[in-house]
Amino acid sequence: WEAGASLQPTLTMVAGNFSATAWGSVDFAATSYKEMDLTLAYALGPVTFSLADLYWEGGAGNRGTVSRSYFRFGADSPHRVEAGITWRISERVPLTLAWNTVLFGAADVNARGERAYATYAEASYPFAVKGVEMKAGIGIVPWNAVGTYGIDRDFYIQNIFLNAGKSWTVLGSLQ
């Protein structure tokens, strides 16, 4: 949301109802935005539970207060741990609702220095156009931490989006 045009590779491995995903982002601009997210998830019917480690060094304005070391887990850690739940209403009406809350991390404090439990909620609708997977939606922040989404205020619209992607199966089966 603050980086502009970016390369965002994703690698997902699935075994039964479990999945592990590595997602990264690096921009093409001078902001040097970098993020690396590792997510474990479990699908239970139309509901998916997830736990993610979000590594982000922060924007240019807070790089002095957040460590740039990937293996730093102290008060100035660039990591956040986030719990999420996603619900796909039905196959016929594939509207998806998601709720993600930061449980801890150096940037999850409000302007007063209190733990904020920054939260992001999203409604999205998937569809396909000529074999390209698409998704349109809206994301909101019901409450926030200044170090997580850049501002410290209550409810606001974070993003309105239209995504397009193409997936390829690299290995059909490892059995």
Q: Which residue ranges define each predicted feature?
A:
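Outer-membrane beta-barrel transmembrane domain signature
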Residues: G4, N17, R88-Q175
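Short, exposed beta-strand/loop patches in secreted or surface proteins that constitute
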Residues: L11, I85, Y125
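Outer-membrane pore/translocation modules
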Residues: A29-E122, Y149-F155
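Short glycine/proline- and aromatic-enriched beta-strand/turn motifs that initiate or cap beta-hairpins
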Residues: W1-F28
